Curated annotation (Swiss-Prot):
Name of the featured protein: DNA repair and recombination protein RAD54-like
Tissue specificity statement from the Swiss-Prot or TrEMBL entry: Hardly detectable in most tissues. Dramatically increased in thymus, spleen and testis.
GO cellular component labels: nucleoplasm; protein-containing complex
Domain Helicase ATP-binding positions: 170-345
Gene designation per UniProt: Rad54l
């Protein structure tokens, strides 16, 4: 018997197919082995008992995806590319990518041949021999402003960026790296400085960043504004660090982190900090080097002896940019402090500057100066301008005439009411403040007298408490007030300026959709504005020193919205005169003048700015014949001085001697305008303008070249015409001028 058929080999034999389960197993011959098909090999073999019928194979099973294919498909759905965990990040912070250093010719970061490219530096041309001789990896490259910025820069801004870059890279004055950006308000100084910072942080002729870090120091009210401007123009390409408040330890920790950043990939290369915070934490910032410092509202550094100046001067950086729309505010020595801060030594010491420049120039500008004094002063002025112009750039606001609607400025002289006149004369008789000024001294009591008279010009309600308390100068004046007078109620008819303001607001509200900004130096005057608005049912917004920085931004944004129902925006010039953009309004009233023309200029520039679409009207209210006109005349003195040194206007007329400016405590009841009287105007006969202003004169011209009106004829503002009709005795004289002729297509 064959071994394969033996009972011991039973388990190894495969059963044959049977017709039914009842059939007995019969041993048969073993079929020869055949090669298994591919389909059969895929079925896993298993042991089957010969006494059981094998399971039928499922040959019609539907096709299914392989598990590995399915997993790969799910992964492709869920997978996301790597994203840098920085908000709004859109590109590399540095100019170099990771990897090996590429050999070959250096290339500029941006194409200098692109249409509209702003090229700040162009390498000197090389001969073919020099190109072969020099190392290609050391050749200087073009410095080209990032196209995202150069495309939005206006022509004067492109010129300004190039000037700034040449100054801070020591190409204008060898060995000096500072400059003053003295453009007037509204010309885009912030954008120009952001462009400068971004360019220095990204590139240089050496194909690497010029600086690693930059610090922007500004008033606390502008810290957020700077942060927003950087975000606006650069998007997520850079992450600035803004600090204005917090605990000392927290601020120190942030500043230490900022100063410890190194290399080409600094995460936060721009620090924005307020003057106050900088002064308190300068010890941390002095520990390292900073590539560039920018000081906004730089006229704060006019005194080289104050702590802020000394703190900034101790910072380890030679590249210094000072932004100030009004570089001269009080005297030339303050101007010297600003120039000395950015470029130490180019004007000598303070003593040398005063002797060589300041005294001869001031002497020549006096109305009583001799011809020799004038000639010597002009020579020193030319010498000073020649030195300073290498590090100072200034463009006046007449450039804006291409981009902004017409601005009409009006200086409105208002007659005091009988109550104001009597209180004014009583105070001068009883306080006798002029006696303290005869020796040229300014005592505490004389300063107090100035404040009292300024408040009286605004409204008698502001000095009512002094009358009740019978303070110096106001003894026995309580009986002058009308019977039953209530200081808590607003009575516009008791103040000449308040009466005119009431008419201006009423006419504007009834005849147009214009909004109005009211500006005053005193919060007490703002209180009167509030009372007047409540009585007249005007919706209003108020911004003063008590409002937080965060809330200011929201209030301004709401007021500027076309859908906002607010009609009046009340502004304290001390708290919010700088940096605010109030283009939602196109009429602004300066209710009282400041000694410093820069403060008034800043406040008046809130509405005539980029984005304004309407004709702007500026009203400067002055009480005729009073201390307010003397203050206004002093402003003209400072502005003429600034114009001579900064604007290079040689033909600015000097109408006021220094002796005349000391006549503060006088009252000329009969004068329609003390300022006009002192001009000795040749274009007016019997207080009526006979000859028009010279061609080309505008708002920046001397006051003698404005229009002079003693009635409503000739006024360019319908609202003021209507107000003059309504208050024929309240308005005595108006100076008015327009910024430029209206251009076609600009409304």
């Amino acid at each position: 018997m064959r071994r394969s058929l033996a009972p011991s080999q039973l388990a190894r034999r495969k059963p044959e197919d049977r017709s039914s389960d009842d059939e007995d197993w019969q041993p048969g011959t073993v079929t020869p082995k055949k090669r298994k098909s591919s389909s059969e090999t895929q079925v896993q073999e298993c042991f089957l008992s010969p006494f059981r019928k094998p399971l039928t194979q499922l040959l019609n099973r539907p096709p299914c995806l392989d598990s590995s294919q399915h997993e790969a498909f799910i992964r492709s759905i869920l997978s996301k590319p790597f994203k840098v965990p920085i908000p709004n990040y859109q590109g590399p912070l540095g100019s170099r990518a990771l990897g090996l250093k590429r050999a070959g010719v250096r290339r500029a970061l941006h194409d200098p041949l692109e249409e509209g490219a702003l090229v700040l530096y162009e390498p000197p041309p090389l001969s073919a021999h020099d190109q072969l001789k020099l190392d290609k990896e050391k050749l200087p490259v073009h410095v080209v402003v990032d196209p995202i910025l150069s495309k939005v820069l206006r022509p004067h801004q492109r010129e300004g960026v190039k000037f700034l870059w040449e100054c801070v890279t020591s190409r204008r004055i060898p060995g000096s790296h500072g400059c003053i950006m003295a453009d007037e308000m509204g010309l885009g100084k912030t954008l120009q400085c952001i462009t400068l910072m971004w360019t220095l942080l990204r590139q240089s002729p050496e194909c690497k960043p010029e600086i690693e870090k930059a610090v922007v120091v500004s008033p606390s009210s502008l810290v957020k504004n700077w942060y927003n401007e950087v975000e606006k123009w650069l998007g997520g390409r850079i992450q600035p660090l803004a600090i204005d408040g917090g605990s000392k330890d927290e601020i120190d920790r942030k500043l230490e982190g900022f100063m410890n950043q190194r290399g080409a990939r600094v995460p936060s290369p721009i620090l924005i900090i307020s003057y106050e915070t900088f002064r308190l934490h300068v010890g941390v910032l002095k520990k390292g080097n900073v590539g560039l410092v920018i000081c906004d509202e730089g006229h704060r550094l006019k005194n080289s002896e104050n702590q802020t100046y000394q703190a900034l001067d101790s910072l380890n950086t030679s590249r210094r940019v000072l932004i100030s729309g009004t570089p001269i505010q009080n005297d030339l020595l303050e101007y010297f402090s600003l120039v000395h801060f950015v470029n130490s030594g180019i004007l000598g010491t303070a003593h040398e500057f005063k002797k060589h420049f300041e005294l001869p120039i001031l002497k020549s500008r006096d109305a009583a100066a001799s011809e020799a004094d004038r000639q010597r002063g002009e020579e020193r002025l030319r010498e000073l301008i020649g030195i300073v112009n290498r590090c100072l750039i200034r463009r006046t606001s007449d450039i804006l005439s291409k981009y902004l609607p017409v601005k009409i400025e009006q200086v409105v002289c208002c007659r005091l009411t009988p109550l104001q006149t009597e209180l004014y004369k009583r105070f001068l008789r009883q306080a006798k403040p002029e006696e303290e000024l005869r020796e040229g001294k300014m005592s505490v009591s004389s300063l107090s007298s100035i404040t009292s008279l300024k408040k009286l010009c605004n409204h008698p309600a502001l000095i009512y408490d002094k009358c009740v308390a019978e303070e110096d100068g106001f003894e026995g004046t309580l009986g002058i007030f009308p019977p039953g007078y209530n200081s808590k109620a607003v009575e516009p008819q008791l103040s000449g300026k308040m009466l005119v303001l009431d008419y201006i607001l009423a006419v504007t509200r009834s005849r147009s959709s214009d909004k109005v900004v009211l500006v005053s130096n005193y919060t007490q005057t703002l209180d009167l504005f509030e009372k007047l608005c409540r009585v007249r049912r005007y919706l209003y917004v108020r911004l003063d020193g008590t409002m937080s920085i965060k809330k200011r931004a929201k209030v301004v944004e709401r007021f500027n919205s076309p859908s906002s129902p607010d009609f009046v925006f009340m502004l304290s010039s001390k708290a919010g005169g700088c940096g605010l953009n109030l283009i939602g309004a196109n009429r602004l009233v300066m209710f009282d003048p400041d000694w410093n023309p820069a403060n008034d200029e800043q406040a008046m520039a809130r509405v005539w700015r980029d984005g304004q679409k309407k004709i702007c009207y500026i009203y400067r209210l002055l009480s005729a014949g009073t201390i307010e006109e003397k203050i206004f005349q002093r402003q003209s003195h400072k502005k003429a001085l600034s114009s001579c040194v900064v604007d290079e206007e040689q033909d600015v007329e000097r109408h006021f001697s220094l002796g005349e400016l000391k006549e503060l405590f006088t009252l000329d009841e009969a004068s329609l305008s003390d300022t006009h009287d002192r001009l000795h105007c040749r274009r007016c006969v019997n207080n009526r303008q006979v000859w028009p202003p010279p061609d080309g004169s505008d708002c920046t011209s001397d006051l003698a070249q404005w229009n002079h009106s003693t009635d409503k004829r000739g006024l360019q503002d319908e609202v003021l015409q209507a107000a003059w009709d309504a208050s024929s005795t309240a308005i005595t004289f108006v100076f008015h001028q327009r910024s430029h002729e209206e251009q076609r297509g600009l409304h």
